[in-house]
A protein has these predicted regions:
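Divalent metal-dependent catalytic cores for phosphoryl transfer on phosphate-bearing substrates
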Residues: 2-136
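Regulatory modules associated with amino-acid/nitrogen control
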Residues: 77, 81-388
Length: 388
């Protein structure tokens, strides 16, 4: 529908032709490609407005994907920054269409419903912002909670059933989780907020692809690594992870898992995941060494040069870790296991796979990160880990 209603949609084809034209020349291919695109448009008599649009798309063809998959879309500052970049609804729509086409055209394995939802969410939120509807955290919080309560009433639960659980959760939980997820978590936890046993629940993802898992247990430094270790042992890939800590010291973590959920035995799969992961968390066995899977022929011959970037976030309270490396089985678990060894806890994990490349982002917290010496040591160990 957006494509059909977009004026001069042929401009998107021009941008698509030039978006990767400068790869392999050295330097930033987006910037170099913008120069080529401007020259082409000028040589072929395009007016300034259309030339600027094509150049904008070529220069920023990776920006929307990176913003949607690596940043927290519940953060008002993220929306402000992205809206300031795109400036107009026309630029936004064009960039959205090009981004979707670029990802889907890369490989069938690269595109999934989760990436589609992230991009659509960013598009709709930014469109509202450009239309004058500036995000209001208080209003967003009220709307999220009201919709979650409405869903809970459909299960014949009273309006105050959630009070004890919700009192332990901070604002960021309600802004980062959707109403459907909040209601799902509440249905399983409201009557056992202070449980001594780990709780693990699984369901088919509402987005229509993959599985969602909820883990609720007393928080521990290596908890995230333990969970990742289990998924790794089952050859399950994490698409997204949202980690929350309640005010009384419990971890409320949710995971989106890539999995073929369209088979007749999916209920048995959900039950098995719940039972096995709960059993692993109860037994608390030592973390097993990661087992790296075989890499594809392309990865062996054209490995991704590993990179690690660790820096304080905008508020200076936590640290943002960005990692780029060749994707392989066991990679995420090996990273989280190393972080646990440094007594660093993961607050948020954004997992992005682009073909053979893994680009993961983590929001971290830990006293060891306040030491510059330990920061350098952690970065060095991560680079060694990521090297093939």
């Amino acid at each position: 529908q957006l494509m059909a209603n977009f004026d001069d949609h042929w401009l998107l084809y021009v941008a698509a032709l030039f978006h990767d034209v400068a790869k392999g020349r050295g330097g930033d291919h987006s910037v170099l490609g913008e120069v080529d695109a401007r020259k082409f448009c000028k040589d072929h008599g395009l007016n300034q407005e259309n030339t600027d649009l094509v150049a904008f798309l070529v220069k920023h063809h990776l920006t929307m994907s990176n913003t949607a998959q690596k940043k927290d879309l519940s953060d008002v500052e993220v929306l402000k920054e992205f809206a300031a970049l795109v400036k107009t609804p026309r630029n936004l729509t064009a960039l959205y269409l090009l981004t979707v086409a670029d990802i889907r055209g890369t490989s069938p394995k690269v595109w999934n419903a989760w990436k589609g939802k992230l991009l659509e969410d960013l598009y709709r939120l930014t469109l509202k912002y450009l239309g004058g509807e500036a995000p209001n955290r208080r209003q967003m919080l009220a709307e999220q909670q009201a919709e979650a309560r409405r869903i809970l009433r459909l299960y014949a639960l009273s309006d105050d059933v959630q009070d004890k659980l919700w009192a332990q959760l901070d604002v960021s939980y309600f802004l980062r989780q959707g109403p459907s997820d909040i209601a799902w978590h509440t249905r399983h936890l409201y009557w056992r907020v202070d449980t001594e046993q780990p709780i693990v629940k699984a369901r088919l993802s509402p987005i229509g692809e993959g599985l969602e898992l909820l883990v609720y247990t007393r928080d521990e430094m290596d908890l995230f690594a333990r969970i990742c270790g289990y998924f790794d042992s089952k050859n399950l890939s994490i698409l997204d992870a949202k980690i929350h800590t309640t005010s009384h010291g419990y971890a409320l973590d949710s995971f989106l898992i890539q999995h073929d959920s369209h088979h007749e035995f999916y209920r048995e799969t959900l039950s098995l995941l719940e039972a096995e992961l709960q059993d692993r968390l109860i037994k608390r066995q030592p973390l097993e060494p990661p087992v790296f899977g075989r890499m594809s022929r392309q990865s062996r011959h054209f490995p991704v040069r590993p990179s690690v970037d660790l820096k304080p976030d905008e508020k200076g309270n936590q640290y943002l870790l960005t990692i780029s490396a060749t994707d392989r089985t066991g990679l995420l678990y090996s990273i989280t296991k190393l972080l646990a060894q440094y007594k660093v806890s993961v607050q948020t994990a954004k997992i992005m796979t682009l073909g053979e490349r893994a680009e993961d982002s983590f929001l971290l917290y830990g006293q060891s990160l306040t030491s510059q010496k330990l920061q350098i040591q952690l970065e060095t160990d991560l680079l060694e880990l990521l090297s093939i």
